């Protein structure tokens, strides 16, 4: 009985030792859970980040950080107002660059 218990233990150990962890399902992790269509005042913006779609999140994400509160808002990249905001910021940045 002792030899069979040791043999079973060794078989289990060798089986578990060779097994690799493989995720059963892919979880999608986007930064933005809820998006806002509300217009944002350029003067109240501290910064705006644009995160492109990736394997971990299929959506383009635009995150605005407000100056006074430091609040981060996820903006709808498909909204006309947000598209024009991004365009205005890009234009402003291109004027600064030599």
UniProtKB/Swiss-Prot annotation:
GO terms for cellular component: external side of plasma membrane; extracellular space. This is C-X-C motif chemokine 10. The modification Citrulline is found at residue 26. Pfam families: IL8 (PF00048). Belongs to the intercrine alpha (chemokine CxC) family. One of its GO terms (biological process) is negative regulation of angiogenesis. It comes from the Eukaryota. Disulfide bonds join 30-57, 32-74. Residues 1-21 form the signal peptide. SUPFAM superfamilies: Interleukin 8-like chemokines. The gene is CXCL10. One of its GO terms (molecular function) is chemoattractant activity. Its main location: secreted. Keywords: Chemotaxis, Citrullination, Cytokine, Disulfide bond, Inflammatory response, Secreted, Signal. SMART domains: SCY (SM00199). Monomer, dimer, and tetramer. Interacts with CXCR3 (via N-terminus). Pro-inflammatory cytokine that is involved in a wide variety of processes such as chemotaxis, differentiation, and activation of peripheral immune cells, regulation of cell growth, apoptosis and modulation of angiostatic effects. Plays thereby an important role during viral infections by stimulating the activation and migration of immune cells to the infected sites. It is found in: Secreted.
């Amino acid at each position: 009985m002792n030899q069979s218990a040791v043999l079973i233990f060794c078989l289990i150990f060798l089986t578990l030792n060779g097994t690799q962890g493989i995720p059963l399902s892919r979880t999608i992790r986007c930064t933005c859970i809820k998006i806002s269509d509300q217009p944002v005042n350029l003067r109240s913006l501290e910064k705006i980040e644009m995160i492109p779609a990736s394997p971990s999140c299929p959506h383009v994400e635009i995150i605005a950080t407000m100056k006074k509160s430091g609040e981060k808002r996820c903006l709808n990249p498909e909204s006309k107002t947000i598209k024009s905001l991004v365009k205005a910021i890009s234009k402003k940045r291109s004027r600064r660059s030599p």
